[in-house]
A protein has these predicted regions:
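Active-site diphosphate/adenylate-binding microenvironment
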Residues: 189-262, 270-272
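Conformationally flexible catalytic loops at phosphate/diphosphate-handling active centers
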Residues: 1-42, 193-199
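A short, small-residue-rich loop immediately preceding and capping a beta-strand
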Residues: 49-52, 105-118, 253, 268-277
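Glycine-rich phosphate/diphosphate-binding loops and the adjacent beta-loop-alpha structural elements
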Residues: 44-57, 67
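Short glycine-rich anion-binding loops that position phosphate/pyrophosphate groups of nucleotides
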Residues: 3-6, 52-54, 79-81, 118-121, ...
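Glycine-rich phosphate/diphosphate-binding loops that line cofactor/substrate pockets in enzymes
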Residues: 32-46, 66, 107-109, 217-224, ...
Length: 277
């Protein structure tokens, strides 16, 4: 507190050994991957929810391989929309406050929810926190053990560990996809297409350009190596909702850091705060 007197003799001193122990990442038990696969096999409507931890652990390619192996839908967190391409047959949108209606219907209809590298904050699960995936058995994988203990999202199977390790372990296991899941995948595809952010009638409106139409047209012109940085407010939210990501594209909001690269970068913002230079 500002102006308070501090007695330094009562402060806890830094202990590098304690710091090292807290930073150690536990190994995921060998029986966990099979337990997850058993849950997937028995579920009627399994759904993977992928967050920023997938990118931070250099696991994007592993995630795509796993989805292809399991043949089940994958949704993405609001700030991880560039993990999975829009035209991927298993893409299930982004069920969040910044997401789309179809994807929200999907997460509410799944009976197994596997979250990978997402801390499931309020911006994701929204304010009716107990209703997010309310019909689902929840498996949560996070490198931060404290995230598994939050009262806002309570997993039935919390897994403290590196999502990269878990994905590698899952890929090594034998698994035959459940043929019944094909109907669920097609239903998810239908929901994504039925409830787009940019409705057909927006293209025929007379008057100022609809921002969703702009986003739609912009992504139609972008290629697989383009990088898009976004400002706050509508520039961020409406783009997250309407983005039709091609695999390899990057999309940032200015709550993170967008480093320069040798590829073309685009910036979309409004009158508010601008992204980092």
């Amino acid at each position: 507190v500002q102006g308070s007197q501090v007695d330094e003799t009562h402060l806890r001193h830094f202990d590098p050994q304690v710091d090292k122990a807290e930073a150690e990442i536990p190994q995921i038990p060998a029986d966990v991957p099979q337990a997850i696969l058993d849950k997937i096999k028995k579920a009627k409507a399994p759904l993977i929810f992928a967050g920023t931890g997938v990118r931070l652990s250099y696991s994007v390619k592993l995630l795509l391989r796993l989805v292809e192996k399991l043949k089940i839908p994958v949704a993405v967190a609001w700030n991880s929309g560039d993990l999975v391409a829009y035209d991927n047959p298993y893409y299930a949108g982004s069920p969040s406050r910044e997401g789309t209606r179809g994807s929200s219907f999907i997460v509410q209809s799944c009976d197994l929810l596997i979250t990978l590298g997402s801390r499931m904050n309020i911006r994701t699960i929204t304010y009716n926190k107990n209703d997010f995936g309310k019909n689902a058995y929840k498996i949560m994988v996070d490198i931060d053990e404290e995230e598994l203990k939050k009262p806002t999202f309570v997993p039935d199977m919390p897994i403290h560990g590196d999502v990269h390790q878990l994905l590698e372990m899952l890929l090594k296991e034998d698994y035959t996809p459940n043929a019944e899941h094909e109907k669920w995948v097609k239903w998810c595809q239908m929901m994504v297409n039925k409830y787009p952010a940019c409705l057909p009638e927006y293209h025929t409106q007379i008057g100022p350009l609809n921002p969703y139409v702009f986003v739609d047209a912009m992504f139609a012109q972008m290629n697989e190596r383009d990088v898009l940085t976004l400002g706050n407010g509508s520039a961020c939210v409406m783009t997250f909702q309407g983005a039709k990501i091609k695999q390899g594209q990057r999309m940032f909001t200015n709550s993170g850091c967008a480093a320069s690269s040798s590829w073309r970068c685009s910036c979309k913002t409004g009158k508010g705060p601008r992204p980092v230079h």
